[in-house]
Amino acid sequence: MDDNKKKALAAALGQIEKQFGKGSIMKLGDNRTMDVETVSTGSLSLDIALGAGGLPMGRIVEIFGPESSGKTTLTLELIAAAQREGKTCAFIDAEHALDPVYAKKLGVNIDELLVSQPDTGEQALEICDALARSGAVDVMVIDSVAALTPKAEIEGEMGDSHMGLQARMLSQAMRKLTGNLKQSNCMAIFINQIRMKIGVMFGNPETTTGGNALKFYASVRLDIRRTGAVKDGDEVVGNETRIKVVKNKIAAPFKQAETQIMYGQGFNREGELIDLGVKHKLVDKAGAWYSYNGDKIGQGKANASKFMRENTEVAAELDKKLREMLLTPAEEKPETDAAPEIEENEEF
């Protein structure tokens, strides 16, 4: 590209970012476009796929997928991680299905978690807006968009038609919430369900509930799917899960994370550490044996994961190394010594 085109492109990009905000346009290969405060999702693989080490503060996030795919588990893991950092969290339980026993198993401090079970969609969104304007809440989870029922629908008869009522309600809420969330640096996570569009012959017939407003206002959209079962002998003890970043305004999108969600435990963090460690040559694998720093840590992935679970300092050290390797922007990484150039007249 010649200099004039480079200058024109730089001016155009500058104008776009000035008009629409940072992150509205980027090169696909960029690791991240700016330093955004993030909260870990509880899954190292997903933090790396997001490109910034977690989900962004002050933004709207949408998590969608089929039933029993791990949507609520992911948000509870994130709440637990946020609480460990001293953040205040709220859970708007529109589905009236939050299990405090399960939340506690995942590490959530249920004594400090704010919970609301609103009667109508308008009430739920007003509570969200009030919490955002207070500036005292850091993370809000709304479970789920499909359960945000407009007041007119609740007060009406079963067969009444309420075309587009929920979509209009959500569209208005997005316009109000976005600015308040940014000013108070509060993250709002909307869990959404999948529906099928009727009569779609070509392309993906799947869509999410509540109209298009949430898709536009969300800075990050995560598609979470169950891909298989984790078995201990014949007993199913968890789900193999794939999470795809379908929209990302803080880093390059379309990356995927593969993880395991164990029943009653949440993410299999130790298994992720082993897999990523082997992939990036921080953990050695010879046959079925895994070694770290020259010491054997277990035969088979299950035993290596058990070692990491019992030796939290080793797990924390490996986690830190992986985050530094995979999440540090290229310009911040220390320069490695260049390979010596071979002179043309040098004999081999």
From Swiss-Prot:
SMART domains, per database record: AAA (SM00382)
Subcellular location: Cytoplasm
Gene3D superfamilies for this protein: P-loop containing nucleotide triphosphate hydrolases
Bias (Acidic residues) ranges: 338-348
GO biological process: DNA recombination; DNA repair; SOS response
Comp. bias regions, Basic and acidic residues: 326-336
Annotated HAMAP family: RecA (MF_00268)
Entry function: Can catalyze the hydrolysis of ATP in the presence of single-stranded DNA, the ATP-dependent uptake of single-stranded DNA by duplex DNA, and the ATP-dependent hybridization of homologous single-stranded DNAs. It interacts with LexA causing its activation and leading to its autocatalytic cleavage.
Protein name (database record): Protein RecA
Species: Aliivibrio fischeri (strain ATCC 700601 / ES114)
Gene from which the chain derives: recA
